[in-house]
């Protein structure tokens, strides 16, 4: 290339950055001060030239700093005029904005201006004053502070010093790079054995001009459900993506999403950015392809993006499938018809039927000859094939991902490689995505993957060398697969292979040195297996290191081998971090480096010679100490050496202090009897917790349970074994220890407490957990002598003792089944043996039993908290039912109100432990979509009358509980709180009415049974038609409305809102109702005699979204009109243009209402003229709105005038599509936002996790199952908002069994699912209602 008329070499290893750095070095400046013009020197580039993709033959580049010095610029206006193109070029390059570039360059003009004037005898003060005056009044500098010249002149020495330093550093770096490039060119070819490149796919492309649309518009209008049925294949679109929006075809069977390879999505993740449209098409073959065992579909990735004045459409085709031009043209035809239906009109077949391989013009045809000028003649270019995808292999090698990434980031020789950290780097991905960039190849995207030949079907056995011989490989051979996913020209593949293999040769040479460096900090397992965690690696590089001898083989030179009398075989179980024995010399060296050592034994125990022990090899536990010995030699050796996290020398009363200093031992938990096995602990005995539970409470390792530095001891505390151990454990936790040492008396005492829990009000509390049991069964269970199950009766015990209880249990446990025969009630327990897991690992927070219908509602925390551990012991215990034990804290440090050495079993809700457990519990709940927190309900309970009162007059007497165990109706009376209550009012029965609630946890109230049920099983009653029932609605649902006399009182006291009736409110015959909250509960109370016609208003959210959309598109419309105004008034100054536009084109009309068409497929600016303009003036609905919009436009005009001016060339609005609600919607597809959301959809589908067992609206395909519908059979389901759409779509499914009767299952909160026959054969639908309307699930058998 010629640079300013002189030869400038561009090397194969050059990148865009290194070329620019070397050009700056030649011109003795730095890259940001380069000004690119063509060889004639008069046509300026609007941005930095791309030296990689389109290297110019000749270019002129100016050093703007030097240019300022040589130009005789007399004012800021001349400065701005001279360098206006450079400001644009610098802003478009991305290093800085136009404003920042102007300010940066302005400081050099200021320095040069004052310096030249000073040389001509003009004082510094006068020059600064001239510049300040021009900044105040002139065009060029009015965006800057008036003191700008004075500040720059005072800082000139530092500015010039920094600049010269940067120039010098750039020249040094450029010289190093040029030398390195020359050396790399001379590097011999790699000796690594690699296979030839195998082409797997070709990239086919064609262009479309006169398309008149944007990517978001294409996304909106694309016919995603269109099917192309050819002779050999069936083409269907799976997904369409742009700007991080994903449109997903809802008509494709959900199982097909399992076939989508997430790596393909990640590889093409650039399609998530703006201005690129990505389409995945599924090609389903109609017959088995040659060499294939099945008719599995192939997924084709299509990319659509602007390319100068045309639209470039690219897609990759497998050469083994699409080996004819006819196949490719069918796909091309399908794409054009799908993407541009508005351009083609009706007779698109006539336009596309011929000569698809060459150029063609496609004239749009519209009904009745009406042609739309927005959609001109569509021109489709010829089909081109120049890019390829494929793979080749490096044999008998593997690469370490972490080491290879290090070289890419830190080794200059690897500067032609880079990774895209936004999408490509992940610990979970074994494949590494890399980009190779040189001036010859442009950007090459490829991936690296370590593989091993496992079978003789491996592709390497099929590949031959250039001379026709098979590769020398066998089963077990390791190799690196290199897959090229994008390369501009397939002729550059040999160049890519040669240079990449040279880099691999460098990698293998440098591998060991880098691996050794990393092994100082992290453990890396060779073989590409990734980084392994290692707790005790020293991460402090400044800390002195001791050369530790390499590990010996097991049995050689171990502690047990060196001192067998002291270290018995079970020692390692007692001390997790053993010390090492060191010599006198090594001990001295360790002490000099601040490591401690101890001698043991020092009292001639066992006639042993004392040895020196050190713990320097444990980063986290460097202090040697002693621990109590309970092994077989404990009579000889009271203590054993061990390593600790803290210094035991400083802990008074520790085993260390006792042995070496003669201090008395401080009592600790070790003085209590302590069970360290999974067995059930006896009454009043302590036991350790499973590791995972202990860690939750703050323990680091279960092996440290009795270490002297342990200050957060949590244990399980035993109760008497029995059926009521749950009640016993909670009672002891709150301090009820009556008869705690007398078994029979304690059991009798606890049994009496249990009997009190069988009252009707307590039974109501348990209905969320006993939802699947008859109330009489629950009552008999509580009264029986069967096991009292914590996961069934948790809420009863919580209310009785006024505590909140957290349950913990083993990961393996039991299944409790109840059974009633005549008057006998029994339960059986299917136990899973706990010995199947190592005891130290199991344990978890536990949830009570609850229904899969709806949500499980949690109650707010009470003041006092109890932790209970449930388990079945070990096989040695051979128990019949689980045992409950209290989790306690052994206080080892003084706490408020509690002495050191005491046991704490009752916690407060603000204790640190409770906050930690509550946080973890909340995180656990996040994994259950059907669990939510309930409201705090401040009612006072009166046990004599079994009622709840709130103190304002509301009295709750009964509750209705639905099939899932949630309270949905409260039956209440109103007793006004007044001192003037008359005798007549006292004698009269108070008003009795029904409060319909949101699902809440059951209250301590009697349960009201629903006695009336609809017996007509053959009549399908749509949810919206309950008002047509011949009998009053109250006869069906036992809902009593309030009288009009109570309306005002309830509205005033509880701030309720009066709502007009809607026939959608099927619970109460379209009655008006009060809506709001009573004591934290969302309620609805129906009003008698107030039937009104339906009134549907937009929701607050919908109104908000509409206003947001109006605001953003109005702003862009005004900006577009202003840009047009600038174009037609070039003779005006910026200020004059703005002022005249405001006067001539803007008008405020407070009565004007904007009406936005939500269904524009392509939002041309001209379509909005009638919406925003009247008599050629833009209408603003308020003065404030006009001020806000015009202020922002003024700021843009001042800062980016040229860009604002260019907006007049646009025809399509950019901001029309911004939210999910802005696009067209249809029941046959759904739209999501974000790559992670879509990948989660794909991965969940792969794992079968889209199985719903709750009723809630959803988009796209799901699986659905309910125990109440055909015995829990799993169905494929779609959700619709219309019964007609649901029936129509199911009838169009050719796979439904039309010999079966049609059934609709209506779900209501009282009866659950009820089945009705309908006159549509094979149709199976579930109907349900949520807050925003009715929904219908179509069910299709999966087997």
From Swiss-Prot:
It is a single-pass membrane protein. Keywords: Membrane, Transmembrane, Transmembrane helix. The keyword Membrane applies. InterPro entries: DUF5757 (IPR043920). It is found in: Membrane. The chain crosses the membrane at residues 432-449. One of its GO terms (cellular component) is membrane. The keyword Magnesium does not apply. Belongs to the IIV-6 295L family. This is Uncharacterized protein 295L. It comes from Invertebrate iridescent virus 6 (IIV-6).
């Amino acid at each position: 290339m010629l640079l300013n008329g002189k030869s400038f070499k561009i090397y194969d290893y050059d990148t865009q950055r290194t070329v620019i750095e070397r050009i700056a070095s030649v011109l003795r400046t730095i890259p940001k001060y380069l000004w690119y013009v063509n060889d004639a020197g008069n046509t300026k580039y609007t941005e930095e030239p791309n030296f990689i993709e389109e290297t110019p033959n000749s270019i002129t580049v100016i050093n703007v700093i030097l240019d300022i010095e040589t130009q005789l610029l007399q004012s800021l206006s001349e400065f701005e005029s001279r360098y206006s193109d450079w400001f644009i070029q610098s802003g478009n390059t991305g290093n800085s904005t136009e404003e920042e570039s102007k300010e940066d360059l302005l400081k050099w003009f200021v320095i040069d201006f004052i310096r030249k004037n000073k040389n001509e005898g003009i004082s510094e003060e006068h020059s600064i004053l001239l510049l300040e005056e021009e900044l105040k009044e002139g065009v060029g500098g009015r965006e800057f502070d008036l003191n700008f010249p004075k500040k720059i002149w005072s800082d000139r020495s530092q500015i010039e010093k920094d600049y010269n330093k940067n120039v010098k550093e750039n020249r040094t770096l450029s010289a190093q790079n040029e030398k390195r490039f020359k050396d790399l060119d001379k590097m011999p070819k790699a000796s690594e054995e690699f296979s030839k490149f195998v082409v797997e796919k070709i990239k086919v492309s064609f262009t479309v001009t006169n398309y008149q649309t944007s990517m978001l518009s294409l996304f909106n209008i694309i016919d995603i459900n269109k099917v192309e049925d050819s002779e050999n294949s069936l083409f269907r679109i799976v997904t369409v993506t742009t700007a991080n929006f994903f449109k997903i075809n809802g008509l494709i069977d959900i199982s097909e999403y399992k076939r989508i390879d997430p790596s393909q999505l990640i590889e093409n993740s650039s399609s998530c950015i703006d201005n690129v449209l990505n389409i995945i098409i599924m090609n389903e073959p109609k017959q088995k392809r040659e060499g294939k065992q099945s008719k599995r579909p192939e997924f084709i990735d299509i990319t659509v993006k602007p390319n100068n004045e045309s639209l470039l459409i690219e897609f990759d085709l497998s050469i083994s499938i699409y080996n004819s031009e006819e196949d490719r043209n069918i796909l091309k035809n399908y794409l054009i018809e799908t993407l541009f239906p508005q351009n083609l009109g009706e007779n698109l077949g006539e336009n596309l039927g011929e000569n698809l391989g060459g150029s063609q013009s496609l004239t749009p045809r519209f009904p009745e000859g009406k042609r739309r000028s927005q959609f001109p003649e569509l021109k489709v270019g010829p089909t081109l094939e120049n890019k390829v995808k494929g793979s080749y292999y490096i044999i008998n090698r593997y690469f370490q991902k972490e080491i290879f990434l290090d070289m890419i980031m830190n080794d200059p020789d690897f500067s032609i490689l880079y990774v895209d950290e936004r999408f490509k780097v992940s610990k979970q991905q074994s494949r590494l995505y890399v980009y190779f960039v040189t001036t010859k190849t442009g950007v090459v995207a490829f991936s690296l993957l370590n593989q091993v030949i496992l079978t003789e079907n491996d592709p390497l056995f099929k590949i031959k060398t250039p001379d026709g011989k098979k590769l020398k490989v066998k089963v077990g051979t390791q190799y690196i697969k290199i897959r090229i996913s994008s390369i501009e020209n397939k002729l550059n593949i040999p160049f890519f292979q040669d240079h990449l293999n040279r880099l691999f040769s460098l990698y293998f040479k440098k591998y060991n040195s880098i691996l050794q460096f990393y092994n100082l900090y992290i453990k890396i397992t060779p073989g590409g297996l990734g980084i392994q965690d290692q707790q005790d690696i020293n991460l402090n590089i400044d800390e002195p290191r001791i050369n530790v001898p390499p590990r010996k083989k097991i049995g050689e030179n171990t502690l047990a081998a060196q001192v067998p009398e002291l270290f018995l075989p079970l020692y390692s179980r007692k001390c997790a971090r053993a010390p090492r024995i060191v010599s006198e010399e090594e001990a001295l060296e360790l002490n000099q480096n601040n490591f401690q050592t101890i001698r043991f034994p020092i009292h001639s125990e066992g006639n042993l010679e004392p040895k020196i022990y050190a713990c320097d090899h444990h980063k986290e536990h460097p202090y040697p100490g002693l621990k109590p010995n309970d092994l077989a030699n404990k009579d000889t050796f009271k203590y054993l050496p061990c390593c600790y996290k803290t210094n035991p020398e400083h802990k008074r009363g520790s085993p260390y202090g006792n042995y070496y200093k003669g201090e008395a031992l401080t009592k600790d938990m070790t003085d209590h009897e302590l069970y360290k096995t999974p067995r059930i602990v006896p009454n009043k005995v302590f036991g350790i917790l499973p590791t995972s539970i202990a860690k939750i409470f703050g323990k680091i390792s279960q092996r440290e349970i009795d270490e002297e530095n342990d200050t957060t001891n949590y244990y399980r505390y035993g109760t008497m074994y029995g059926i009521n151990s749950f009640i016993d454990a909670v009672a002891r936790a709150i301090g009820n220890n009556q008869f705690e040492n007398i078994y029979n008396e304690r059991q009798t005492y606890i049994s009496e407490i249990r009997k009190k829990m069988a009252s009707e009000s307590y039974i109501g509390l348990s209905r969320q957990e006993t939802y699947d049991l008859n109330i009489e069964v629950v009552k008999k269970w509580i009264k029986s002598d069967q096991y009292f199950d914590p996961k069934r009766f948790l809420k009863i015990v919580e209310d009785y003792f006024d505590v909140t209880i957290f349950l913990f249990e083993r990961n393996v446990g039991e299944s409790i089944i109840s059974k009633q025969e005549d008057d006998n009630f029994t339960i059986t327990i299917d136990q899973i043996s706990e010995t199947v897991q190592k005891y130290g690992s199991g344990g978890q927070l536990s949830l009570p039993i609850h229904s899969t219908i709806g949500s499980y509602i949690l109650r707010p925390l009470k003041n006092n908290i109890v932790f209970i551990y449930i388990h079945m012991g070990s096989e040695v215990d051979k128990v019949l039912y689980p045992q409950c034990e209290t989790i306690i804290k052994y206080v080892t440090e003084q706490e408020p109100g509690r002495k050191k050495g005491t046991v704490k079993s009752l916690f407060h809700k603000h204790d640190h432990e409770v906050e930690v457990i509550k946080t973890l519990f909340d995180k656990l709940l996040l994994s259950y979509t059907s669990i939510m927190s309930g409201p705090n309900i401040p009612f006072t309970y009166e046990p004599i009358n079994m009622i709840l009162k709130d103190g304002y007059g509301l009295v709750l007497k009964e509750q209705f509980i639905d099939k899932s165990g949630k309270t949905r109706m409260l039956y209440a009376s109103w007793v006004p709180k007044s001192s003037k209550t008359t005798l007549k009012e006292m004698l009269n029965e108070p008003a009795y009415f029904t409060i319909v609630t949101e699902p809440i946890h059951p209250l301590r109230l009697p349960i009201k049974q629903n006695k009336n049920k609809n017996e007509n099983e053959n009549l399908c009653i749509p949810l919206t038609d309950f008002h047509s029932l011949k009998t009053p609605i109250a006869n069906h649902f036992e809902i009593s409305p309030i009288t009009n006399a109570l309306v005002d009182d309830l509205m005033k006291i509880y701030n309720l809102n009066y709502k007009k009736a809607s026939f959608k409110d099927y619970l109460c015959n379209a009655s008006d109702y009060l809506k709001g909250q009573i004591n934290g509960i969302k309620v609805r109370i129906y009003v008698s005699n107030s039937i009104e016609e339906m009134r549907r208003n937009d929701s607050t959210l919908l109104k908000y979204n509409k206003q947001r959309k109006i605001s953003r598109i109005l702003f862009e419309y005004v900006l577009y009109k202003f840009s047009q105004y600038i174009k037609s008034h070039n003779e005006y100054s910026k200020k004059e243009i703005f002022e005249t536009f405001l006067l001539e084109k803007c008008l405020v009309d407070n009565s004007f209402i904007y009406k936005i068409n939500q269904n524009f497929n392509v939002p041309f600016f001209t379509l909005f003229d009638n919406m925003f303009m009247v008599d050629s003036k833009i209408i603003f609905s308020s003065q404030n709105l006009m001020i806000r919009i015009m202020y922002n436009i003024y700021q843009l005009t001042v800062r980016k005038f040229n860009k604002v001016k260019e907006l007049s060339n646009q025809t399509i609005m950019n901001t029309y599509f911004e939210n999910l609600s802005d696009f067209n919607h249809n029941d046959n597809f759904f739209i999501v936002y974000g790559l992670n959301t879509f990948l989660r959809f794909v991965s969940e589908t792969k794992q079968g996790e889209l199985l719903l067992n709750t009723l809630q609206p959803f988009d796209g395909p799901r699986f659905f199952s309910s125990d109440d519908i055909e015995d829990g059979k799993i169905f494929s389901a779609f959700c619709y908002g219309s019964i007609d759409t649901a029936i129509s779509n199911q009838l169009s499914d050719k796979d439904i069994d039309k010999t079966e009767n049609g059934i609709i299952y209506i779900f209501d909160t009282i009866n659950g699912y009820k089945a009705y026959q309908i006159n549509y054969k094979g149709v199976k639908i579930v109907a349900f209602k949520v807050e925003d309307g009715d929904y219908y699930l179509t069910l299709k058998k999966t087997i």
